[in-house]
């Protein structure tokens, strides 16, 4: 039976661990929500364990470094995990061996963003190709500048013909552009398109089990029934 609550205080005694989404739950991309900042402080006073997970395509150090500017104390969180971090670790260390001899990468990202190339730091053993025909895997982080989903079909067809695997660093389908409040597609939309075409897609962010399991590794002897995940999207968080 669904229960509608007015405040986190209504259920705080039922859980020991709180897993929090970032965008839309804690902040709007620019400023932390006052109610979220206050709720985090209250949870800490109640000795609750707090974890942040995000479908950001960036590595987790980026999310950690932003917390202070958004009004949060980074020391309140025992772990911060992003889908980008999960994918970076997988590509770097081949944890699950999703592909053989992955060396040549076609990197989808917005080159107009100052930090667009930061994801490549530490991936020096890989060749980053400008043509998908020269790649044996795709790293999908953020959409190319001024593109729409239909623009990716030729790229995906070429990749599909050669069984190229796609690693999706941000599995969200859409986000909201804060300046004009417009919906913008994320790489989850492109990954879903490739999947429906028959391509192999690796997603380790929400709502997959992997990111939840990884983020909870720093907690010992916890009861799964006393973990609460808080998000703002049924498609992205559940």
Model-derived regions, located:
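HAD-like aspartate-dependent phosphatase fold
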Residues: 1-238
